[in-house]
Structures are given as C-alpha cells and as structure tokens.
Amino acid sequence: MAKVLCVLYDDPVDGYPKTYARDDLPKIDHYPGGQTLPTPKAIDFTPGQLLGSVSGELGLRKYLESNGHTLVVTSDKDGPDSVFERELVDADVVISQPFWPAYLTPERIAKAKNLKLALTAGIGSDHVDLQSAIDRNVTVAEVTYCNSISVAEHVVMMILSLVRNYLPSHEWARKGGWNIADCVSHAYDLEAMHVGTVAAGRIGLAVLRRLAPFDVHLHYTDRHRLPESVEKELNLTWHATREDMYPVCDVVTLNCPLHPETEHMINDETLKLFKRGAYIVNTARGKLCDRDAVARALESGRLAGYAGDVWFPQPAPKDHPWRTMPYNGMTPHISGTTLTAQARYAAGTREILECFFEGRPIRDEYLIVQGGALAGTGAHSYSKGNATGGSEEAAKFKKAV
C-alpha cells in the first residue's frame, strides 16, 4: 500500500468554515475546446467546500484509507526540519499545489527513494525538478484546464482594477474619505487601449476572449500561432517576439510557463521597451519578472501599475518589495483556487490517483513527465530540449537511460 504526502495551505485564521456564502456551484459540462471535466469514479466531498486547505484534504482521506493507503497532510513545507522534509523519505506519492508549492528539488527527489508520482492539484509543475523526475522515472502530472478560466477571470479583474485605480479609491472610502481627485488622477478607461498577452494557450486565449467586448485592441505573442479563424474572430495582432509586442501595448498580461527562456523576461532592459505608464498583470509565475526591476519601474513611473498573485518564493517574505511598491494590486496566490476551481482540481486529483493505483493510463493532457521523458502537456509546454529546474536553475532535458 502507498504513502501519499499532501501539502496544502493553512486553514482560515478563524478555523475551517462550517457554512459558505453560496449553497451550490453552477454546473458546466466541458471546458472551452471540448475537454471533459475530471471523471473520477466517485468523490467524497460537496462541491463548493474549502478543499485546498489542510482540513479540506482535497476530499481524499476516505478514498485513500478505504483502499489501504496512508495519507499525510501538512502545510509545513519549508526547511530541513519541516514535516514535508521528514515525511518525504518514504512517500510514494507527493501532492502539492501551485498556490502553496512543495518544491521538489533534485536533492529532495534523490532523498525520496519510493517516490513514483508527483501530482499537482492545479496547473503548473515548475516546483518539480523535471530533469530529476525524468532521471528517476517519477511520473509528473497535473489537472490541466481545471482552473484556467478562474485565472483568466482574475486577470481581467486585475486589469480593470489597475486601469481604473480601484484599490486606492476603495481605500479612501474604507477610511471614511471622499477624495475624488485623489482617486481619479490615476484612473483611465480601458476602452481603445492596446492589450497584449505573452502566450495564448488556455489561459491567454480565455483572457483575450473576455477582453474583446471591452472594445480594446488585442495583441499576442506565442510560439504556437493561433488559427487564422481565431485571429479574425477576435481581431488579434500576432507578434513574432515579446520585444516586438511590448512597445505597442498599454497593458501586458503574462500567461506563459516558467522555463529558461522566460525566467526574468521582465527586467530593467525589457522594461525600457514598454510605453511609459503601461500596466503589467502576472498570474503565471513570479520568477518571470525581476523583482527589484518591477519595483523600480513603479517608483520611477515607467509602469503605471503592476498586479498579480504569483511571487518567488511562495509564501512571500513579509518584507518582499511587491507588498509595498506604489500602484500594486498584489494578492496571495489565489487566482486559481476559488471554491469553484477547487472542486475541479480535487476531482482531477482523485481521477489521477485512481488511474495510478489501478494501473490505468492517466489522461495524456494531465501528463508532464512519464516513462523517463516529457509527455503529454509537458512535451507541448516546454521548449525543445529545455524546461524548468524545479524552483531554481533550469537544466537541459535529456531522456533517462
């Protein structure tokens, strides 16, 4: 029987909720593009519950223990004396989330002699050193598309919040003020602005579709160009490189994976290409941006605003400059972990575990690494010959021999 080590974020400070704001969730049959939702044989939770925190356990305990497996759940993931470090030694399966990542570095993977599956409850497995997973024949899987729309909605919200100067205006109201001039002296209409996305995959394309009704000019850059029919439908302008797109955009949203080509792609030099007073929204990965360069750009006025929910490391230290830099709209990493999204990624996690334990194939779209090589979504997402090296440096990918 297997030991499953699950790393989840802490419960609410007031305790695990007994009631919720809504009684149910809207139902959808499939994702845009036709991919079906997760199809586990059963679930042991009510959709709409808090599943991503420690007490929620992704709704997995009953299923795992009834089949003879052991489940260890913790939020204590960092440092040599953490629960995660201690329990990893004999774990067969590690489950983590992008929002509260348990970094599977080469050293940790080498230490985990029994590890067979690294499962991301969500999208994005850059917290796993994929080369080490390849070398050790560890399967890496994630619940593709489970929260893509959740993130896309968050991006649109953040764009509007920055451009309309919503957060400082709300703060005036909260503090009892009525300082209209202070609110509107940094506020603009989104209409007719040029908005571009770096990457137009599931999330990037969903962002473009949601922005189209705002009568903006839409731009994108991506290795994989969208079909001509989609470009015409949304009146998209494609740019061969990021550097070509930056100068024409008032707003740039980052929706690409983290790998060697994209790490710190927003830096002092590339920020010089942006329009003065541009906005950046980053819900992809914190290391896409040079931390201090972003803060300097806001302080100098090069950028009019920066918003996102991704940091490095996560959780961010209390003195991280993105917490206090001017005109920021930062939140903890929450865009993809709404209660709606949790129901989907918990069900997808259950589906992957069922397939893994029963010896059935895991969906190709869920796979990142399998059989000592990049597989499925992983083979498509990462540049040929390269991928991310867990939480730190990237390594050249080579197939295990």
From Swiss-Prot:
<dbReference type="GO" id="GO:0005737">
    <property type="term" value="C:cytoplasm"/>
</dbReference>
<dbReference type="InterPro" id="IPR006139">
    <property type="entry name" value="D-isomer_2_OHA_DH_cat_dom"/>
</dbReference>
<keyword id="KW-0560">Oxidoreductase</keyword>
<feature type="binding site">
    <location>
        <position position="283"/>
    </location>
    <ligand>
        <name>NAD(+)</name>
    </ligand>
</feature>
<feature type="binding site">
    <location>
        <begin position="257"/>
        <end position="261"/>
    </location>
    <ligand>
        <name>NAD(+)</name>
    </ligand>
</feature>
<dbReference type="GO" id="GO:0008863">
    <property type="term" value="F:formate dehydrogenase (NAD+) activity"/>
</dbReference>
<dbReference type="InterPro" id="IPR029753">
    <property type="entry name" value="D-isomer_DH_CS"/>
</dbReference>
<feature type="binding site">
    <location>
        <position position="147"/>
    </location>
    <ligand>
        <name>substrate</name>
    </ligand>
</feature>
<dbReference type="InterPro" id="IPR033689">
    <property type="entry name" value="FDH_NAD-dep"/>
</dbReference>
<dbReference type="Pfam" id="PF02826">
    <property type="entry name" value="2-Hacid_dh_C"/>
</dbReference>
<feature type="binding site">
    <location>
        <begin position="333"/>
        <end position="336"/>
    </location>
    <ligand>
        <name>NAD(+)</name>
    </ligand>
</feature>
<comment type="subunit">
    <text>Homodimer.</text>
</comment>
<comment type="function">
    <text>Catalyzes the NAD(+)-dependent oxidation of formate to carbon dioxide. Formate oxidation is the final step in the methanol oxidation pathway in methylotrophic microorganisms. Has a role in the detoxification of exogenous formate in non-methylotrophic organisms.</text>
</comment>
<keyword id="KW-0520">NAD</keyword>
<protein>
    <recommendedName>
        <fullName>Formate dehydrogenase</fullName>
        <ecNumber>1.17.1.9</ecNumber>
    </recommendedName>
</protein>
<dbReference type="GO" id="GO:0016616">
    <property type="term" value="F:oxidoreductase activity, acting on the CH-OH group of donors, NAD or NADP as acceptor"/>
</dbReference>
<comment type="similarity">
    <text>Belongs to the D-isomer specific 2-hydroxyacid dehydrogenase family. FDH subfamily.</text>
</comment>
<keyword id="KW-0963">Cytoplasm</keyword>
<feature type="binding site">
    <location>
        <position position="123"/>
    </location>
    <ligand>
        <name>substrate</name>
    </ligand>
</feature>
<feature type="binding site">
    <location>
        <position position="309"/>
    </location>
    <ligand>
        <name>NAD(+)</name>
    </ligand>
</feature>
<dbReference type="GO" id="GO:0042183">
    <property type="term" value="P:formate catabolic process"/>
</dbReference>
<feature type="binding site">
    <location>
        <begin position="202"/>
        <end position="203"/>
    </location>
    <ligand>
        <name>NAD(+)</name>
    </ligand>
</feature>
<feature type="binding site">
    <location>
        <position position="381"/>
    </location>
    <ligand>
        <name>NAD(+)</name>
    </ligand>
</feature>
<feature type="binding site">
    <location>
        <position position="148"/>
    </location>
    <ligand>
        <name>NAD(+)</name>
    </ligand>
</feature>
<feature type="site" description="Important for catalytic activity">
    <location>
        <position position="333"/>
    </location>
</feature>
<dbReference type="InterPro" id="IPR029752">
    <property type="entry name" value="D-isomer_DH_CS1"/>
</dbReference>
<dbReference type="Pfam" id="PF00389">
    <property type="entry name" value="2-Hacid_dh"/>
</dbReference>
<dbReference type="GO" id="GO:0051287">
    <property type="term" value="F:NAD binding"/>
</dbReference>
<dbReference type="InterPro" id="IPR006140">
    <property type="entry name" value="D-isomer_DH_NAD-bd"/>
</dbReference>
<feature type="binding site">
    <location>
        <position position="222"/>
    </location>
    <ligand>
        <name>NAD(+)</name>
    </ligand>
</feature>
<dbReference type="InterPro" id="IPR036291">
    <property type="entry name" value="NAD(P)-bd_dom_sf"/>
</dbReference>
<feature type="site" description="Important for catalytic activity">
    <location>
        <position position="285"/>
    </location>
</feature>
